[in-house]
């Protein structure tokens, strides 16, 4: 199993907009660095655990943010 995952940037951005949360606010809520949230918003690979923290902070599953 890969230690990194790539999420669908559109899904991340849409969920952030739906919840009216900024990248900085999401990073703080998830306990990750702003750069990790920025990578996810750009569709770049991040550590699986980081994606899990961000998904949990958004109240969604990692799978719902994954590219399909």
Please provide the spans of the model-predicted regions.
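Residues in the helix-turn-helix
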Residues: 25, 36, 64
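Short, basic-rich loop-to-helix N-cap that marks the start of a DNA-contacting helix
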Residues: 43-56
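Short C-terminal boundary/hinge segments that cap the last helix of small helical domains
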Residues: 59-68
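A short, Lys/Arg-rich alpha-helix, primarily the initiator
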Residues: 1-25
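Residues within the alpha-helical elements of helix-turn-helix
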Residues: 18, 29, 57
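Short alpha-helical "recognition helix" segments of helix-turn-helix
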Residues: 26-27, 54
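Recognition helix of helix-turn-helix/homeodomain-like DNA-binding domains
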Residues: 31-46
């Amino acid at each position: 199993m890969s230690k990194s995952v790539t999420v669908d940037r559109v899904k991340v951005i849409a969920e952030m907009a739906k919840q009216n949360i900024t990248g900085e606010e999401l990073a703080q809520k998830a306990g990750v660095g702003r750069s990790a949230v920025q990578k996810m918003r750009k569709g770049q690979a991040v550590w699986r655990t980081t994606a899990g923290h961000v998904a949990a902070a958004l109240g969604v599953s990692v799978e719902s943010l994954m590219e399909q």
